[in-house]
Amino acid sequence: MADQLTEEQIAEFKEAFSLFDKDGDGTITTKELGTVMRSLGQNPTEAELQDMINEVDADGNGTIDFPEFLTMMARKMKDTDSEEEIREAFRVFDKDGNGYISAAELRHVMTNLGEKLTDEEVDEMIREADIDGDGQVNYEEFVTMMTSK
């Protein structure tokens, strides 16, 4: 996981890690973790922090060493990438760029993908994703649909 990071990213994370490794012993406490991540533009909730700590703190001693920290940051960045992929997919469907996917736009993309759908099938797909009932799919609805699997 951490091997997918660039040298620049690793250097950036090392710098941030060092800032919070007060006594220079190569570990940071779980309490310091949230501060480190926020300094890098991440915004984890308390529950997310606890989950991340539990995942990487193998010996359960409440501290995290740098390799563990790198693994965790790489995971967090992977999540961010998938958000960008969803945004990109939405742009593909939203042909006219008005912020909504209409039945016609959905039909067009599905046809290009080799999916020959009836009008009823297309309308049903829109209905399933259309939370506010306006007959089209906005970005928030699209994200909900894409992440609810």
From Swiss-Prot:
What InterPro entries does the annotation carry? CALM/Myosin/TropC-like (IPR050230), EF-hand-dom_pair (IPR011992), EF_Hand_1_Ca_BS (IPR018247), EF_hand_dom (IPR002048)
PTM N-acetylalanine: at which residues?
Answer: 2
Q: List where the protein spans the membrane.
A: none
Q: Residues bearing N6,N6,N6-trimethyllysine?
A: 116
GO cellular component assignments: myosin II complex
Q: Where does Ca(2+) 1 bind?
A: 21, 23, 25, 27, 32
CDD domains, A to Z: EFh
- Give the binding site residues for Ca(2+) 2: 57, 59, 61, 63, 68
Q: Where does Ca(2+) 3 bind?
A: 94, 96, 98, 100, 105
- Top-rank taxon: Eukaryota
Which is an annotated GO molecular function term of this record? calcium ion binding
Residues bound to Ca(2+) 4: 130, 132, 134, 136, 141
Location of the EF-hand domain: 8-43, 44-79, 81-116, 117-149
Which keywords does UniProt give here?
A: Acetylation, Calcium, Metal-binding, Methylation, Repeat
Q: What does this protein do?
A: Calmodulin mediates the control of a large number of enzymes, ion channels and other proteins by Ca(2+). Among the enzymes to be stimulated by the calmodulin-Ca(2+) complex are a number of protein kinases and phosphatases.
To which protein family does this belong? Belongs to the calmodulin family.
UniProt miscellaneous comment: This protein has four functional calcium-binding sites.
This chain's protein is named Calmodulin
